[in-house]
Amino acid sequence: MEIIFGQNKKEQLEPVQAKVTGSIPAWLQGTLLRNGPGMHTVGESKYNHWFDGLALLHSFSIRDGEVFYRSKYLQSDTYIANIEANRIVVSEFGTMAYPDPCKNIFSKAFSYLSHTIPDFTDNCLINIMKCGEDFYATTETNYIRKIDPQTLETLEKVDYRKYVAVNLATSHPHYDEAGNVLNMGTSVVDKGRTKYVIFKIPATVPDSKKKGKSPVKHAEVFCSISSRSLLSPSYYHSFGVTENYVVFLEQPFKLDILKMATAYMRGVSWASCMSFDREDKTYIHIIDQRTRKPVPTKFYTDPMVVFHHVNAYEEDGCVLFDVIAYEDSSLYQLFYLANLNKDFEEKSRLTSVPTLRRFAVPLHVDKDAEVGSNLVKVSSTTATALKEKDGHVYCQPEVLYEGLELPRINYAYNGKPYRYIFAAEVQWSPVPTKILKYDILTKSSLKWSEESCWPAEPLFVPTPGAKDEDDGVILSAIVSTDPQKLPFLLILDAKSFTELARASVDADMHLDLHGLFIPDADWNAVKQTPAETQEVENSDHPTDPTAPELSHSENDFTAGHGGSSL
């Protein structure tokens, strides 16, 4: 078995044509753009955690039945500094980098001081975000990197802190029908408060305000929620939205800010400053988008760890939301590279299997309701919300399915009643070996698998003009533990889950995390421009001859959604 995790991957800078078997639907024209860690060793130094690896972008351009593949490392400041030094010099969440041992004591002391309030990495390895006419590689720090989706060139570095007060931000924003972006971040001890900030980025900017600036630079705070702890805010990877509400889980998987501030001096990583409190609760915050204020009732559930929200919607006076939940934080621990050896598949076991859980939260609590009564009147779920003596509401979920991760949906149904979830099947081992279609209504599933194959997150692309929720295709980049088998792009019929085609690539492809599909409806005569604040090298780099230019119509793309780096 070939080791998949932790290997350095080679870039495929020029497009290489894939070998297509089967038949690609004629309507499927566009680019699948994905992101994930691709380099874990720099010189003699190694990252500790798989999620620390340097970002490697890759794309599949699908046109007229042909597929072209290319990949390129994100030219972040982190990447450039590491490569120039031929060692890891910028800290990641699971790996602390240290000053040159040849520096004198005064230089070392200054380094310790500067790391007390760390300037986080711009190694944006988790997802791709569409914002107006621009595309950005994203991570969970305050930095995002603008990229050219055709050439995979790295453009502008953007610091969220210049526009909204956040030190951390999710890589799983939401998009409304107009193309506006809604995201969340954490503001640490800002003016004496630690808070969770929901912010909005407009899809377009009025000409009077544009002045060459991207919509990100017109981001504004939508609302904020005070953290229950000033110095131990909750870690979160995603959030949910309905047509009228935002769903945020303040879970007992926490960041210890004091420990993070002293991590560099103590010689430990920032990841070691996270802890899961089994004795605490998970608090459910429901924010009304119309008033920009939280619903006043206190909702909570048992302690759990959630990385990915699946979807949320309103029904019969309740907010229903679906998440992938764990009983503990063991998933993150398993992805330390020391654990990712040849015995990984056989010996690595989660202490908690990921479960698909549905919660129902009543929007209006009857003050006269009896203590202990179930406030949920929705017939479609067995989830409960029990009124307590102090007026708080204890929510217990309906468990829909056990053993899945990396969930995706038909994004046209985001925030609305829906039926289908597409995900990677994950049992007690965190290795994804199957792609799953789960039918919430019938509680049935369809699966795809192939020996020695590890699928990436399955992404749904709808058939143009589709009326059925599952009318479309599933795209997944597949890598193999068999060195004799080429990696390939898998295309499934989303209804039947049968294989339509695959495009095998003779290239060094990595196991990625998240991304999006850009239909050719978005490609036109407007070229992505370099940043106004920095000069982009290689501006005369030739574009992919298989791709037209980009015009960025607002809604004709399939977005990453709310979903550490999973």
Curated annotation (Swiss-Prot):
Expressed in liver, kidney, small intestine and testis. Its EC number is 1.13.11.63. Changing residue 237 to A: No effect on protein abundance. Loss of beta-carotene 15,15'-monooxygenase activity. Decreased iron binding. Fe cation binds at residues 172, 237, 308, 514. Residues 530-566 are annotated as: Disordered. It is an enzyme of class 1 (oxidoreductase). Disulfide bonds: none annotated. Changing residue 450 to A: No significant effect on beta-carotene 15,15'-monooxygenase activity. InterPro entries: Carotenoid_Oase. One of its GO terms (biological process) is retinol metabolic process. GO terms for molecular function: beta-carotene 15,15'-dioxygenase activity; metal ion binding. Changing residue 457 to A: Decreased beta-carotene 15,15'-monooxygenase activity. Belongs to the carotenoid oxygenase family. This is Beta,beta-carotene 15,15'-dioxygenase. It comes from Mus musculus. The lineage of its organism: Eukaryota, Metazoa, Chordata, Craniata, Vertebrata. The gene is Bco1.
